[in-house]
C-alpha cells in the first residue's frame, strides 16, 4: 500500500496511473495457495477482477486455475500461463464464436448459466466432434446482505438456473451425448463480510447436492462455492489480507463434502483489490 516514502518515489510520474504493491500481492496469493493446500481445495482466480499480465502470470505460477467470463479473458488467461485444462469459461453472454474458440482450445469446462446455453454448447460440440465438460450455475435464492448491485443469488438476478428447472436440466444432460456433466457452481454476491451468509449458502448447496446425487442419480465431481469474500475498506492498513482462513473454515465446517468430490472456489476481488491503487 502507498505510504509517504513510496509517494515521494513516485513524484514526477504523470498521472493517472495504477500502483501495485507487489509484495502485498504475492503475500496474499501465497497465503491463499497455502490454505488451499491445507484444506485440500481448488482455487480458480476470477480473471475479471484484474487482467494485468504480471499479476496473472504470478497467480498461474502458483497452480491456480482461471475463471473467465468472456472469450478474450479465456485467450488472455491462456496466454498468461494458465493451462487450458485449468480454465473454466463462465458468464451469461457467450457468443458462438467464443464457445467455438474455447472448444478448440480444450478448456477444462463451460460453466453454464441457462438451459438454452447447454443446448447450444451440446450442438456445437457435436458439430465439431468434441465432448465438452459442463458445470451448471445454480441460483440458490439467498440474500447475500450486500449492496443490491453486487448480489447475484436471488431469484430476480439474471445468473444461474433455478431449482424449478432441475427436471429439465437433468433431462437435457442425460440426452446430450457431447456433454459431460462436471459439477455445480454457486455464487451469491460480492463484498460479503457476514460469514453467516456463507453458512446459509452451504446449507442450501448441501440440500441441492444431496438431491442431485441421490434421488436424481447425477454424478458430480466438484462443487464450486464461488467467491464473494469482502475486503476491509474501512481499515485497509490494519487488515490488508482478507480473512481467507475463516472463510475456508466456514465451508469446511458447514458443508459435508462427499469423499469422491472436490470443493472449489473462485476468488477475485479478495485476492487483488487491496494490492492496487489508482493515483491521480
Language model feature labels by segment:
Residues 1-132, 171, 175-180, 207, ...:
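A charged N-terminal "starter" segment
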Amino acid at each position: 500500500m502507498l505510504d509517504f516514502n513510496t509517494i515521494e518515489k513516485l513524484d514526477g510520474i504523470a498521472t493517472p496511473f495504477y500502483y501495485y504493491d507487489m509484495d502485498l500481492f504475492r503475500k496474499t496469493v501465497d497465503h491463499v495457495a497455502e490454505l488451499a493446500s491445507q484444506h485440500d481445495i481448488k482455487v480458480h482466480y476470477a480473471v475479471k477482477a484484474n487482467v494485468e499480465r504480471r499479476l496473472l502470470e504470478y497467480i498461474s505460477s502458483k497452480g491456480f486455475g482461471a475463471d473467465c467470463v468472456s472469450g478474450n479473458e479465456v485467450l488472455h488467461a491462456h496466454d498468461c500461463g494458465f493451462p487450458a485444462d485449468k480454465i473454466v469459461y463462465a458468464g451469461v453472454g457467450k457468443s458462438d464464436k467464443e464457445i467455438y474458440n474455447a472448444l478448440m482450445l480444450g478448456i477444462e469446462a463451460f460453466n453454464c448459466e441457462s438451459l438454452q446455453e447447454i443446448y447450444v454448447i451440446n450442438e456445437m460440440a457435436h458439430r465439431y466432434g468434441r465432448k465438452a465438460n459442463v458445470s451448471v450455475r445454480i441460483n440458490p435464492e439467498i440474500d447475500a446482505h450486500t449492496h443490491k448491485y453486487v448480489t447475484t443469488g436471488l431469484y430476480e438476478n439474471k445468473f444461474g438456473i433455478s431449482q424449478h428447472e432441475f427436471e429439465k436440466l437433468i433431462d437435457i444432460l442425460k440426452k446430450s451425448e457431447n456433454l459431460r456433466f462436471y459439477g455445480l457452481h454457486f455464487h451469491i454476491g460480492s463484498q460479503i463480510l457476514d460469514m453467516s451468509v456463507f453458512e446459509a449458502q452451504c446449507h442450501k448447496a448441501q440440500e441441492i447436492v444431496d438431491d442431485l446425487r441421490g434421488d436424481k442419480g447425477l454424478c458430480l465431481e466438484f462443487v464450486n462455492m464461488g467467491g464473494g469474500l469482502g475486503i476491509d475498506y474501512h481499515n485497509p492498513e490494519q487488515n490488508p489480507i482478507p480473512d481467507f482462513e475463516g472463510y475456508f473454515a466456514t465451508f469446511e465446517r458447514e458443508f459435508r463434502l462427499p469423499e469422491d468430490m472436490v470443493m472449489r472456489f473462485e476468488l477475485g476481488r479478495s485476492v487483488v483489490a487491496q494490492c492496487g491503487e489508482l493515483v491521480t
